[in-house]
Amino acid sequence: MNSKSITPVSTTHREDYCPPAFWIDSVDLTFDLDAAKTRVLNKMRVRRNPAVAAQALRLDGDGLTLARVLVNGQGTSFKMDGNALVLENLPEGEQPFDVEIFTTCAPEKNTRLEGLYYSEGCFFTQCEAEGFRRITYFLDRPDVMSTWRVLLRADKQRYPVLLSNGNLLEQGDLPDGRHYAQWSDPFRKPCYLFALVAGLLVAREQRITSRAGKEHLLQVYVRPGDLDKTGYAMQSLQASVAWDEARFGLSLDLERFMIVATSDFNMGAMENKGLNIFNTKYVLAKPSTATDGDYHGIESVIGHEYFHNWTGNRITCRDWFQLSLKEGLTVFRDQEFSQDMAGSASARAVCRIANVRGLRQHQFSEDAGPMAHPVRPEQYQEISNFYTSTVYEKGAEVVRLYQTLLGRDGFRQGLDLYISRHDGQAVTCDDFAQCMADANPASTLAQHLDIFKRWYSQAGTPQLHASGSYDAATRSYTLTLRQSCPATPGQTDKAPFLIPVRMGLLAANGQALPLHLKNGDVQGVASNNSAG
C-alpha cells in the first residue's frame, strides 16, 4: 500500500469539548422521496450562543448535493471546507434568524446505511451517532436540541405509509398519484434521534389509557406477511409503557408510539423519538418457531428502546463521551424491567444471574485486554467503535451501585430530581451523579461523591479481598476488606473505588443475626469500604 494514500486518523478528546457557537431552536424539513434523488428542504431557526465568541456557522454534511442557501429569505455567500458548509455573513446579535438549505441525496446508493437509505422498496434512516449529516447540513452533535416538523411527500402506491417522529398533524393526497404526511415532535431533541420510514407496511395497533387518563396509540409496523408474528412485541411494548409509569412515574408523552421492524436494519434497534426502528430479530416471533431466548430478547430490547424515551431522548448526552449516561442507565432500567416481569423471587434471581454471567463473559474480558477503557472514555478515533460492553453493561452496574448505596427509594428520589432538573437538556455523567447526591444529602454517596465517580474515569475490574475473624469471648466479628485493580492501557496506578458491600451473619440454625455495629447503628445489612 502506498503510504501517501492513507488518510490521517484524528483523535477526539473529552477535555476538548466546547459548547456550540449557535443553537438551532426549530427545524422544518420537507422531503420529496425518490430512491434515486431525494430532495430535502431544511428550514432552521438559528441563534448565536452568547456564551461563545462570534464565529462562522459551520454545518456538518456528507455525500450531499447542495442547491441553495438562504438566510432570512435572501441569498448569501458560503464556502465548503471539506464536507462542511461554512456561513460567515450572518446577522449579528442574539436575535434568531432563518437559514434555509436545499439539498439532494441518493438513498439507493447509500450502502453505508447511515442517514437516509433505500432497501427492498422502503426508505429508512439511521442517524446515531453521526448519520444525520448524510441527510442535510446541520450541527450534527447531541447538545444541539430542537423542536421538529417534518413533511413527507412520495408516490402513494409505492409508499403508502409515511412515518416520522412525534404526532401526526395531517395527511392527504397530492396530484400525480402522490400523497403527503406532516409530523410534529414538540419535545426538543438532537438530530441523532430523527427518523423517517416510508414504504409498503402494515401495522398491529393497540389503544391504551395511561394512569393519568390520557389515550395513546401503539403501533408495530412490519412488511406484509409478518403481522401474525407481532403479538408478543405489542405485549412487550404495552408492558414497558405500564412498567415505566408504575416504577418511575414516567409516562408516554406523545399521542402515539411506533415501532418499525425490518430485516434491512443493521443496528439491532434504535430509540428515535416516538419512532423506534428495529431489526426483525427483536420484534417477530411465533410460538411454533421462537425459543424462550427469542421472547426474552424481544421483551428486553423493546423495553430498552422505549425506556430511552426519558433516559436518552428527553434528557440526552452533552457529547458522545457521555454515552453511558443514556445507555448504562437504560440497560439498568431494562434489566430491572425484565426482573419485574419474571415475577417470582427465583425467576428474578435467574435474570440477575444471566446478566452477571454476560458481564463476566464479555465485559470482564474487555476490561482485562488491550481495549480496556473507562465507562466514560477520554478519547476516540471512530465514534462507531464507542458502543462497547463497558459503556453499556459496566455502565449499568455503575447505575446499580447508586441503587445499592441509596436503596430503591433513594435511587427513585435521585432519578426524580434528575428528570425535573434536566428535562430537555443535554447533560453529563457528572450531572447525573450530582442529582443522586443532592437528592440524598446524608448518604455515603453524597459524602464520598468524588471517590464514587472514579467508576466513570478508571478502567479495569477491581478485585475485592475479604477476610473475617470471630472472637467468641467478646462475641464480635471483624471483616477486613482490601481492594486492588490491575493496570490498564494508559492507567498504571489506580485510586481506590467506592464499593458497597452487603453482608450478614447466620446462626447455627441458619437464621440471620442482628448486627450491632461499633458506631452504635443496628442494621440487618452493613456496608464497609476500605482500600489497601
Identify the meaning behind each predicted range.
Residues 26-28, 37-43, 56, 84, ...:
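Intrinsic-disorder/low-complexity, polar/charged segments enriched in Ser/Thr/Lys/Arg/Asp/Glu/Gln
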Residues 102-205:
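Extended, low-hydrophobicity, Ser/Thr/Pro/Gly-biased non-transmembrane segments
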Residues 56, 73-93, 126-135, 223, ...:
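Aromatic/His-enriched, Gly/Pro-containing loop or helix-boundary segments
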Residues 49-119, 176-177, 532:
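A surface-exposed beta-strand-loop module
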Residues 1-39, 117-126, 138, 142, ...:
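N-terminal, polar/Ser/Thr-rich
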Residues 183, 214-469, 479:
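Hydrophobic alpha-helical and helix-loop surface patches within well-folded domains
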Residues 65-71, 445-450, 461-532:
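Beta-strand-rich binding/interaction modules
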Residues 41, 45-63, 137-140, 146-155, ...:
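Surface-exposed beta-strand/loop patches in extracellular or lumenal glycoproteins
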